[in-house]
């Protein structure tokens, strides 16, 4: 991975264009595209369905099965991009590695993309090779092994596929009657053919947070911690800065640096932690902008998306501070919608220091994030109230006209 692309940025839709190929075109990818276009970068969005959010703002788009190595290679060969940015896990990562050996820049690296999509690898790497503190865990690829792992760790446990995203296939076992159902849920939600699951000790944590970690040519820079809440393993609210002691913050930074150094490459990493009885515990890592980091659209002068592009291109990364305490809240629907329409946006935007992001997803299903509110205030509590109230103003329904 070369960090020197920023030494010469071309002109979009011309022979000298600097071209970014985005694999995965959801709401986070959309913000990456917008940040790239502010730097005059030509953008190409790829996903498995038409009218994905990032496609709506990119110069060009392709609809393919990104797990199909042949289809992926054809797009890359046709576009010959300067940079390839994977934004989701469901990609033919072996093909990415082959493309990288042929000279294409994959962010942060093809190997990091492959390894971090696998909870088994990243947990064993973090706990056993790097030596960071994690909760107790085990893996299983058959029911008998799974059942024994649950018994050994002890209920309550969290059960997840080793490969999935956004909480898919995740559930909590709080009593014996839920063991079978959790196994079936994890297997059904897996993005791999192995059907392997991870069984984790349920951490009754005091808080959870994300440390947005920027690896760049001059070293590693950390954003102020982002606190967050989740429901069914998926982001619901976040705020920045999240309160930590100096010791907790230092510990988290040391862990994040060790793990991201082991992965290599440049860009932003979302490193998740729990705090339990004052102890910082490593949870998960994503080698890309993080959903909880949507709050940085309002709280930082440079959002996580701006920082991601700067790090990738080899542009300067300044010290990162919170301009003003900020919060975000996700707009989540609870029913299937084929033509989503939004009302109440005017009411939400009448609130002080509130902004709205409607992601532009072409359809909805229960639990799908369709937008978010971001807010700032004199303190975290007020910012959280504003973001939550703004989301509550907005209603999503099928447009029957």
Swiss-Prot record:
TM segment ranges: none
HAMAP family: PurT
Residues binding Mg(2+): 272, 284
Binding site for N(1)-(5-phospho-beta-D-ribosyl)glycinamide: 27-28, 87, 291, 361, 368-369
Function: Involved in the de novo purine biosynthesis. Catalyzes the transfer of formate to 5-phospho-ribosyl-glycinamide (GAR), producing 5-phospho-ribosyl-N-formylglycinamide (FGAR). Formate is provided by PurU via hydrolysis of 10-formyl-tetrahydrofolate.
Name of protein: Formate-dependent phosphoribosylglycinamide formyltransferase
Gene: purT
Subunit annotation: Homodimer.
Originating species: Haloquadratum walsbyi (strain DSM 16790 / HBSQ001)
GO biological process: 'de novo' IMP biosynthetic process
Any one Pfam family match given in the protein's UniProt record, by short name: PurT_C
């Amino acid at each position: 991975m070369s960090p020197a692309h920023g030494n010469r940025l071309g002109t979009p839709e011309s022979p000298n264009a600097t071209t970014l190929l985005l694999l995965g075109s959801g709401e986070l990818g959309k913000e990456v595209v917008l940040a790239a276009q502010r730097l005059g970068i030509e953008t190409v969005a790829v996903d498995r369905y038409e009218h994905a959010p990032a496609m709506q703002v990119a110069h060009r788009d392709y609809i393919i099965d990104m797990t199909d190595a042949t289809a992926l290679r054809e797009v890359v060969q046709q576009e010959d991009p300067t940079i390839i940015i994977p934004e989701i896990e469901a990609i033919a990562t072996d093909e990415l590695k082959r493309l990288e050996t042929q000279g294409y820049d994959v962010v942060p690296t093809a190997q990091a993309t492959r390894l971090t999509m696998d909870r088994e690898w990243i947990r064993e790497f973090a706990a056993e090779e790097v030596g960071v503190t994690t909760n107790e865990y085990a893996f299983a690829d058959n029911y008998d092994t799974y059942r024994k792992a649950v018994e050994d760790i002890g209920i309550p446990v969290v059960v997840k596929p080793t490969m999935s995203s956004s909480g898919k296939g995740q559930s909590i076992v709080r009593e014996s009657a839920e063991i079978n159902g959790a196994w079936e849920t994890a297997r059904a939600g897996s993005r791999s053919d192995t059907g392997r699951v991870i069984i984790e000790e349920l951490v009754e944590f005091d808080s959870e947070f994300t440390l947005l970690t920027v690896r760049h040519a001059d070293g590693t820079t950390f954003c102020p911690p982002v606190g967050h809440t989740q429901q069914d393993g998926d982001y619901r609210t976040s705020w920045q800065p999240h309160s930590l002691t100096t010791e907790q913050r230092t510990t988290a930074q040391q862990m994040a640096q060790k793990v991201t150094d082991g992965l290599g490459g440049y860009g932003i990493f979302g490193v998740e932690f729990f705090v339990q009885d004052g102890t910082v515990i490593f949870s998960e890592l994503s080698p890309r902008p993080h959903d909880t980091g949507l709050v940085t659209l309002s709280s930082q002068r440079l959002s996580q998306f701006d920082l991601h592009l700067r790090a990738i291109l080899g542009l300067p990364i300044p010290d990162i501070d919170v301009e003003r305490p900020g919060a975000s809240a996700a707009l989540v629907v609870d029913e299937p919608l084929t033509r989503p329409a939004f009302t109440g946006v005017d009411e939400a935007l009448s609130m002080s220091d509130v902004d709205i992001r409607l992601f532009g997803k072409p359809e909805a299903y229960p639990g799908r994030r369709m937008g978010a509110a971001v807010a700032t205030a004199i303190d975290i509590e007020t910012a959280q109230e504003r973001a939550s109230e703004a989301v509550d103003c907005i209603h999503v329904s099928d447009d029957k006209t």
